[in-house]
């Protein structure tokens, strides 16, 4: 296919137009008075959301060059979401501000390489200062406040704080759709390990790219499955029962994997294969843990067991299994409570006896997975559209809370970014490097400016007033008061704020140093030739 090229100012202006279209759509959702965005769906009713990354992913522009600019900023939102789980709108706002100011200066003749260096220096200083003013999460109230700010709902904040209290800060918390209209919390016995599906064609939910199995059989083995004939008798028995299957094995490759995928795609039966967690002797122990939880027998040569001879009664079962590209979560395993209790006691004895800190840490992880369980937040709403929107909010709040536990929290509402301006302004460089620093200084004001704009106020006036306030005092757009944001419970996780700034600066710096853009040239499809009019034949037979 032929390519179309644009250079220098032409290329950058087109990409900036794409950046603006995406960012202007996303930034309307920022803050407690942010608006919603309605997304058209190919099937079913439109989706209403205020989730930055969901909106960014949905935007495709007709112009190839503009679309590339939009996609680069969408990448900022996605990366921030992957690292911190929240802060995608803030990241988009920061990226747009840095790119726009940078483009102005590059167009005026500044050296983009010098500007990039200045952006990197300023970002590093801002991140350092964010860590200095960060507070550790030391109470259930702080957890509830972080979650409440992210979800814009105090009840959600309390729910997430309760969930973390029950399963621990590192425990497994999942968000599911409820059949009723109330949102509630329940804790079920379950386990999560860090192995995802071996093929993306095994997913059942294409939007979230995860596989959900209800009441599946679970085959656990330390063997490699390469030949489908090894498990064919077992698969035939499972197909007859019409149940799903989770395979946990050393590996599934050769002809076995494509055969399983083909049967999944054809709808013969629902199957997901994952690699066994851990390595060496630790892997054997973890497989035994999973087997105890699910009531399975580990198919291993150590016990003289072969895959060809495996029967259904050697398989485990569970109420639900969810597999993502990175993790597998088993909920409501059918193992006997006495066997699980015995296994837990055995691990506790090993913890007491071990002299290695590393071994103790790994044993405690296993204990938490066996004994801690999984907290499930069941989201309820009156309509399906509201349900999806609520679920997005709770998932964001949960991610934000985990981020706060990890790196602490800072004053919310964009106040922390203004609080670091003084430190960044103290940097003194020359020429275009200083220009890059000044660009970041201006961008740090942008989240507060946008929150104020969304609340119907003049953003620049609010920014100047926040600058004149003591550290951590800012504008609460929810009630219109000026107050200490920490004391008012308006908190942002440090990790979220840091990731948003770092990712925005990274992509912005790359765009500013772009000198050429290559895109596919649109094909000119000529109109098909019109059919000949029979009457033009003059009645010829």
Curated annotation (Swiss-Prot):
Catalysis performed (reactions): ATP + H2O + a folded polypeptide = ADP + phosphate + an unfolded polypeptide
Subunit structure: Forms a cylinder of 14 subunits composed of two heptameric rings stacked back-to-back. Interacts with the co-chaperonin GroES.
Species this protein is from: Latilactobacillus sakei subsp. sakei (strain 23K) (Lactobacillus sakei subsp. sakei)
GO cellular component: cytoplasm
Cell location: Cytoplasm
Keywords noted in UniProt: ATP-binding, Chaperone, Cytoplasm, Isomerase, Nucleotide-binding
Binding, ATP: 29-32, 86-90, 413, 476-478, 492
Claim: Ligase is one of the keywords in the record: no
PROSITE patterns documented for this protein: CHAPERONINS_CPN60 (PS00296)
Name of this chain's protein: Chaperonin GroEL
Main localization category: cytoplasm
Location of the region described as Disordered in the Swiss-Prot/TrEMBL record: 521-541
Lineage: Bacteria, Bacillati, Bacillota, Bacilli, Lactobacillales
Pfam families: Cpn60_TCP1 (PF00118)
Highest taxon of source: Bacteria
Record's function text: Together with its co-chaperonin GroES, plays an essential role in assisting protein folding. The GroEL-GroES system forms a nano-cage that allows encapsulation of the non-native substrate proteins and provides a physical environment optimized to promote and accelerate protein folding.
EC numbers, comma separated: 5.6.1.7
């Amino acid at each position: 296919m032929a390519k179309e090229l644009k250079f220098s100012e032409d290329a950058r202006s087109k990409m900036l137009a794409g950046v603006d279209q995406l960012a202007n759509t996303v930034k309307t959702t920022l803050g407690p008075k942010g608006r919603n965005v309605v997304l058209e769906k190919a099937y079913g009713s439109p989706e209403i959301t205020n989730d930055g990354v969901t909106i960014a992913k949905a935007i495709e522009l007709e112009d190839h060059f503009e679309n590339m600019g939009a996609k680069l900023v969408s990448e900022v939102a996605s990366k921030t979401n992957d690292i911190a789980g929240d802060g995608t709108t803030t990241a988009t706002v920061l990226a747009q501000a840095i790119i726009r100011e940078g483009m102005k200066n590059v167009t005026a003749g500044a050296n983009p390489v010098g500007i990039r260096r200045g952006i990197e220096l300023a970002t590093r200083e801002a991140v350092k200062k964010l860590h200095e003013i960060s507070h550790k999460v030391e109470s259930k109230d702080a957890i509830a406040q972080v979650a409440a700010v992210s979800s814009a709902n105090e009840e959600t904040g309390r729910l997430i704080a309760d969930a973390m209290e029950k399963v621990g800060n590192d425990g497994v918390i999942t968000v599911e759709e409820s059949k009723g209209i109330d949102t509630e919390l329940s804790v079920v016995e379950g386990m999560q390990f860090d192995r995802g599906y071996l093929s993306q064609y095994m997913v059942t939910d294409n939007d979230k790219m995860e596989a959900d199995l209800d009441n599946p059989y679970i085959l656990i083995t330390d063997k490699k499955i390469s030949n489908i004939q090894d498990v064919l008798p077992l698969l035939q028995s499972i197909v007859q029962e019409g149940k799903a299957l989770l395979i946990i094995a050393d590996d599934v490759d050769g002809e076995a994997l494509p055969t399983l995928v083909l049967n999944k795609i054809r709808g013969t039966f629902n199957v997901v294969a994952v690699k066994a967690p851990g390595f060496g002797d630790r892997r054997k122990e973890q497989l035994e843990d999973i087997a105890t939880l699910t009531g399975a027998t580990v198919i291993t040569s150590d016990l003289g067991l072969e895959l060809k001879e495996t029967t259904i009664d050697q398989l485990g079962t569970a109420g639900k299994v969810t597999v993502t590209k990175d993790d597998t979560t088993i909920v409501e395993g059918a193992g006997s409570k006495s066997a699980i209790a015995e296994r837990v006691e055995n691990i506790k004895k090993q913890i007491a006896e071990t002299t290695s800190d590393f071994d103790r840490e790994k044993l405690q992880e296993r204990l938490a997975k066996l004994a801690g369980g999984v907290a499930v937040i069941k989201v309820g709403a009156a309509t399906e559209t509201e349900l999806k929107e609520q679920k997005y909010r709770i998932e964001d709040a949960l991610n934000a809370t985990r981020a706060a536990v990890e790196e602490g929290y800072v004053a919310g509402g964009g106040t922390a970014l203004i609080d670091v301006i003084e430190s960044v302004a103290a940097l003194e460089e020359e020429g275009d490097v200083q220009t890059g620093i000044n660009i970041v200084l201006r961008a740090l004001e942008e989240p507060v400016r946008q929150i104020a704009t969304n609340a119907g106020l003049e953003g620049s006036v609010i920014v100047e007033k926040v600058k004149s306030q003591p550290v951590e005092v800012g504008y609460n757009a929810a009630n219109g008061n000026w107050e200490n944001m920490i004391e008012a419970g308006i908190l942002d996780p440090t990790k979220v704020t840091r990731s948003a700034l770092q990712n925005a600066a990274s992509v912005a710096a790359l765009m500013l140093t772009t000198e050429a853009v290559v895109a596919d040239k649109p094909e000119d499809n000529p109109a098909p030739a019109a059919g000949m009019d029979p009457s033009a034949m003059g009645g010829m037979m």
